[in-house]
Amino acid sequence: MTRREFLTATASLALCARGGVSCGWRENAALGAAMRQYVANGLFGGIVCASSRGDFLCAGNRTLMPDGGPMTKNSMFDLASVGKTQTAALCALLYADGRLDVDAPFTEYIPEHVLAKENCKITVCDLATHSGGFDNSKPYMTSDSKAYFERLFAKRPVYARGERFKYACSNFVYLGLIVERLTGLGLDAAAKKLLWGPLGMKRTTWNTVVNNPDAVEFARSTYEGPIRRIGEHNDICAHLAPRPMGNGSCFSTASDMLKFCEDMLKREKFPKSYYDLQFTACFDKGGHRRSFGWDMTAEKSTFAAWTKTNFSDSAICHTGWTGSAIAVDPKRSFAGVVLASQQAGKSLTMGPRMELLELMAAVPGGKGNETLKGKEMAK
């Protein structure tokens, strides 16, 4: 931990002692205590949690130095891979509108890909479930726009289609390009028109938020490459890319992400097929179970901590490198958001994120809502 990060953690203790900042309408002492403890232990610089149960609690600081002020309901986070859910949602909307065939080879929409001339069988849905055979190598990691797309379109799968689940950011880069081509818009404009606008998500963007006073700062240990200004993309590929890409790295607030998750739960704004696609297991093999763009409860998971929660087999969840996690569980009538600035790495912070989701999902006195401790989930 750097001196700057140490000072931040020390300053956060003062906020913890005052009990954090509550913006919600439900008393959840266990949630507040857990958030304060995770900040005090240096796992996170700050956290904002919100849920359909009425939770809305903030803890810690917005920046690495305490003079940046505390986290608030307006704090704007780099979602990292949680942003993949926004790409998936846009694809689902195009599918519901009849403009996207998720069972078609993805090369029908990206004909310049090297596989287009090789009778490609990898479908759009395969990309969304990370089962098409691509690995997470990133040969397109360059700031040269021409080279970026040449390398992206030359990338080949390393496994047979449908053989296994293998998380790969390039899958969602391809999906983002498909959205652009079907809408004739950049991702930010497409999302504002089709998704964020209808949901009232006015504080979400795919663009950088360098001059936004609510932008959250992330520790140097969370990213590669040059030092970022507050509000620049944390992910190195997103930072170097010529424009926003579908692998994530949107910026948003807990309020906006709760609007998105609550709509997934209530199914009110969009066609039924939009929701069904994202809640239906499209890949179930080797202990991994995935819907279109989301992880689902299974024997294994992208992150083991998810399998140790009480979420049902209908639940969907996604996490991001920077420290966030969102979940929607129809059987528990729950939607929850954890946005945070992790400082201790993925392995040490994934369990605590799941614990915070559980603490919000649990109904006091409800059967089957016993929560697991973050340290147990992290095993």
Whereabouts are the PLM-identified features?
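N-terminal export signals
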Residues: E5-G24
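A short acidic/small-residue loop/turn micro-motif
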Residues: A17, R62-P66, Q342-G345
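Short, conserved catalytic-motif segment at the N-terminal edge
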Residues: W25-F77, E150
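Short active-site loop at a secondary-structure junction
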Residues: N41-I47, D67-D126, Y159-S170, M245-G248, ...
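Short, surface-exposed loop or secondary-structure junction motifs
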Residues: F56, G60-N61, A116-A315
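Short, well-ordered beta-strand elements
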Residues: L57, G323-Q343
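Short, gly/Ser/Thr-rich active-site loops of penicillin-recognizing serine hydrolases
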Residues: A281, G286, E299-F303, G345-K379
